[in-house]
């Protein structure tokens, strides 16, 4: 459960991301593909090379979903219900991959905003991404 302080930290951090969200989403995906090559199996139809338009487009989808989640911190299940259905029933993504992408998102945010990536911000963003992952995997059961 996100505390009021966590919610404030997440909103502040995501506010600094601003218009860079799609770029950071794509960068996090690239990090994930390079660091955890098994994740590529979910994207056999993608050009996974650096700067790929397909990775950029999917990065934007990730960023848009996270932006929506930040706007609905008190109702993540409601805000992400359609994505949960998609990932559980159609795409059948292994739940561990959400944790891997979350880690890569944290690394990307820290790389771009080192002075803002305080221990408190890191902890709050980690909790937020864990909650998003939990919601996205909730319909696997």
Curated annotation (Swiss-Prot):
Give the modified residues of type N6-acetyllysine.
Answer: 16
**Which residues of the sequence carry a binding annotation for heme b?**
87
Domain of life the protein comes from: Eukaryota
Report residues binding O2: 58
Please report any disulfide bonds recorded for this protein chain, giving both cysteine positions. none
Q: Which residues form the Globin domain?
A: 1-141
Q: Which UniProt keywords apply?
A: Acetylation, Heme, Iron, Metal-binding, Oxygen transport, Phosphoprotein, Transport
As stated in the Swiss-Prot or TrEMBL entry, residues carrying the post-translational modification Phosphothreonine are 108, 134, 137
Gene Ontology cellular component annotations, sorted alphabetically:
blood microparticle; haptoglobin-hemoglobin complex; hemoglobin complex
Residues with the modification Phosphoserine, per the entry, are 3, 35, 49, 102, 124, 138
Q: One GO BP annotation here?
A: hydrogen peroxide catabolic process
Family annotation (PROSITE patterns): GLOBIN
Question: Listed GO molecular functions?
Answer: haptoglobin binding; heme binding; iron ion binding; organic acid binding; oxygen binding; oxygen carrier activity; peroxidase activity
Cross-referenced CDD domains, in alphabetical order?
Answer: Hb-alpha-like (cd08927)
InterPro entries per UniProt: Globin, Globin-like_sf, Globin/Proto, Hemoglobin_a-typ, Hemoglobin_oxygen_transport, Hemoglobin_pi
- For the modification Phosphotyrosine, the affected residues are 24
Subunit structure comment from the entry: Heterotetramer of two alpha chains and two beta chains.
The job of this chain, per UniProt, is described as: Involved in oxygen transport from the lung to the various peripheral tissues.
What family does this chain come from, according to its entry?
Belongs to the globin family.
- Kindly provide the name given to this protein in its UniProt entry: Hemoglobin subunit alpha
């Amino acid at each position: 459960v996100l505390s009021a302080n966590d919610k404030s930290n997440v909103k502040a951090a995501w506010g600094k991301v601003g218009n860079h969200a799609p770029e950071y989403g794509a960068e996090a995906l690239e990090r994930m593909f390079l660091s955890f090559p098994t994740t590529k199996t979910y994207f056999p139809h993608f050009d996974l090379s650096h700067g790929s338009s397909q990775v950029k487009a999917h990065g934007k989808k990730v960023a848009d979903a996270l932006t929506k989640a930040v706007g609905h911190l008190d109702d993540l299940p409601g805000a992400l219900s359609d994505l949960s259905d998609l990932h559980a029933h159609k795409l059948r993504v292994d739940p561990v991959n959400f944790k891997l992408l979350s880690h890569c998102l944290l690394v990307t945010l820290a790389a771009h905003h080192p002075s803002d990536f305080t221990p408190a911000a890191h902890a709050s963003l980690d909790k937020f991404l864990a909650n998003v992952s939990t919601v996205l995997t909730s319909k696997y059961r």
